Amino acid sequence: MAASPLVRFAPSPTGFLHIGNARPALLNALFARRAGGRFLLRLDDTDRERSTEEFASAVAEDLGWLGITPDLFFRQSERTALYDTAAERLKAAGRLYPCYETPEELDRRRKRQLGRGLPPIYDRAALALSEADRAALEAEGRRPHWRFKLDHRVVAWNDLVRGESHVDCASLSDPVLVRADGSYLYTLPSVVDDAEVGVTDVIRGEDHVTNTGVQVQLFEALGAAIPAFGHHNLLTTADGEGLSKRLGHLSLRSLREAGYEPAAVRSLAVLTGSAEAVRPVASLDELASLVDLAHLSRAPARFDPAELDGMNARLVHEMPLDAVRERLAALGVPAEAADAFWAAVRANLGRVAEAADWWRVVAGPVTPVVSEPDFIARAARLLPEAPFDAGTWKAWTDAVKAETGAKGRALFMPLRLALTGLDHGPDLSALLPLIGRERAARRLAGETA
């Protein structure tokens, strides 16, 4: 690993980022953080039809929510001149050649190859075209797309995740780098950018392993330094299906809007499918210390929303007041009550936003459920005077128990129903002082208060 690595996350702004995109983004950012390196956000927006400014803005917003602040940023759409220069170099070297087949012609050719038991790779027929042949095709209105001529050899590298790896480029079609309309596909701009800014480590999903064989040859053809490569396992759904931007409920935006903590999403996205126990890690620095690419599993990493729920709850239960003070204020909790309220309710929350429900129980109005009127009337007469404190609930229930003989559930449940309207919730020794004597007395009397 270089002394000061430069890594990159390069999404296409063609949809909202999902939990599967969070994995490479975080692995790269944490890798750089651990090694004192830098993180580049590059928008691969060469797909002019599908790339939108809305999705580009959402990428930055989602990364910020995860706690990732890029050190460098650029868009590929602003760097076309660099790609043009590289393409001309490859043409001059005989490595980029024009092809004129239509998609339909290529499809028929592939079917014939399969029918003869041959691998369906491009047969380089365009290399046999003469100048006159090409002129005739262009006179028909055809415009060439451009393929990179691969050396038919094995490309090997020491993968940061998988160890010794290789791709036999003889088994691959020469990849199209430039479309007939002159726009670039992913491969050439990616290599040019990595070379130009000095990316040292390319950390990405294992679905890019084959691309690495092609890209290594491109780096070589352009006379550029070859970065280290690492290909991590992919997140899948709990059923083992691949994630895509079409799964809106697993988009980072939807998870944020649903009230999940970024630390819970980070922890699950990074630790799932690793040698580390999957657990909530609140600190980015601590999470970075746990990232060891060589200890990632080769098996798919299954993302289970139920596991996210549990992890989020564990984080919320341990959150100090300072971490949620502003959010509690936004939910309507007065500053003077926030400390006692948060201490009372946090162990009952799965998400911070659920605190709003318990503040409504405290401040009202609550319609009491008086299931045993005689018992509640006797309990109301024994209600201590104000002010209430942490010992009020025990003193009161001891007195009610002595007066009525009720104990256990028969003692506590009717009181909980009358005071909160619910059969579950935080410890009433903590909640009762927040409710206060006046509201408690009115609820015990059957009033909505």
From Swiss-Prot:
GO CC terms of this entry: cytoplasm
EC nos: 6.1.1.17
Subunit details: Monomer.
Organismal lineage: Bacteria, Pseudomonadati, Pseudomonadota, Alphaproteobacteria, Hyphomicrobiales
Sequence intervals crossing the membrane: none
Motif 'KMSKS' region boundaries: 242-246
Name by which UniProt lists this protein: Glutamate--tRNA ligase 2
Encoding gene (name): gltX2
A molecular-function term among this protein's GO annotations: ATP binding
Any Gene Ontology biological process: glutamyl-tRNA aminoacylation
Localization in the cell: Cytoplasm
Residue numbers binding ATP: 245
Assigned keywords, A-Z: Aminoacyl-tRNA synthetase, ATP-binding, Cytoplasm, Ligase, Nucleotide-binding, Protein biosynthesis
InterPro entries linked: aa-tRNA-synth_I_cd-bd, aa-tRNA-synth_I_codon-bd_sub2, aa-tRNA-synth_I_CS, aa_tRNA-synth_I_cd-bd_sf, Glu-tRNA-ligase_bac/mito, Glu/Gln-tRNA-synth, Glu/Gln-tRNA-synth_Ib_cat-dom, GluQ/Sye
Group of enzyme by EC: ligase
Pfam families documented for this protein: Anticodon_2, tRNA-synt_1c
Signal peptide boundaries: none
